[in-house]
């Protein structure tokens, strides 16, 4: 293990000189192999093509290589109309674990635009005032027929929406870097875009030096890995829980409140300090030392400690249960915790039982310029009805997670690359031979334990852990304001009984600014049933389903109507998705084809 942990600034990359296309297909049913036709658009020239076979589409892209081809959900669907399983497996990739960012084949770089726009294409179109319309029913139901010009226009509209999105996000990124999109390449993900903009606008002067040989500035900062590792232990993530809702029981007259951009809010709040990785120290683990740091406006701390909540004291600290899930209802906490929650716990009446380790750091405000600058731009765009407001919002919300990336060993799948690795002297100690299809020992790949995928050059858990801790404190205060009327919470929202409305709004700031709360349900939810985390159903006065939240299962049919069993965990649920590449390799399936899985809730399922 390295004795130094580094964080390095990322700048703008050189412009890509090849052509850039967007691609979309229509199929007979949810099956990339049942190709009806496809369309493409050159995002720079606007030239559009229609392909009546996947072979024609592939030939077009390879004849124009080197080029980049974007499709929305490319690695779950569209790509596998062009590449077969063997080709996709052997192709060189940019990936982190099973997350694929780019597949390279015959000098064509295939990319998935969902990494830039983590939303449905219809939502992207709506933001541009370019509604994509409804998918023709014959494609949904696999009723094969002649392709019409109306069909083609529908598919081309998808390409135009995606091309518009890529141009706009590239323009936004480049201008934020003080460049034009013709002078710099577009990063692979919205998180990478956010990090590069932050580096350009907010990198600290003391985080770097002038190289004596080149005379160029090197933007980098270092710390003892111990501090990064202990902050990783304090990185608990978001809070989702049933509070006073009884699982599976009806509750009447419910309201939902959401915090406006909670994570950007806590990042930019002037009272919130974050640890400077270049100024960290271990401190004698005593209660007095902890309290002194908490009361010092120049420093922040995090501690490995044990705390407990006496009877009647609010419980809100994250505890990892035996099932591997976070539990916020426990009266005892043991582990690493960041200062914001230690401070709130002491305020609410928690008692420190023992402190095992205590670390402190100089406190800094690294996000104020980044968030405040983007927020000002977002408000300008919003007042002008400019669709780029959505892009700015994504950039504001995508930064903090970049600091908490956990890189994984690089996978090597290309046969030539595997052969090269096997000839290296350090092969036995460096590489691990694995198989996607372990039963038949097929589709081998190597894990390179000396080289990681994903950027650990941006990893500083001090930022990601403290952002989440501050956010959980904001959420905890809202839940406490709801009192026994608080039913459910999910990261930045609270559901309460209507009778708790007056008290909640007295104690919590409401409005449209960063961090203020807003009533998302001006029409009261007449009836709700909360089953478990990420699973609840709302009903209107006529007992019709108003909203169904059920992570991992299908709740609507192809017409957008709720399924009969949607939102009823006592009944059989189904997930409907497409086969991804690595699943296809493991299970002997065809990527890009429909996959339906039956799911029965382990607690509530009663049979059909």
Summary of predicted features, one role per range:
Residues 15-22, 31-35, 41-608:
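Conserved acidic
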Residues 1-21:
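N-terminal accessory regions of nucleic-acid-interacting proteins
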Residues 28:
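Conserved Rossmann-like nucleotide-cofactor binding loop
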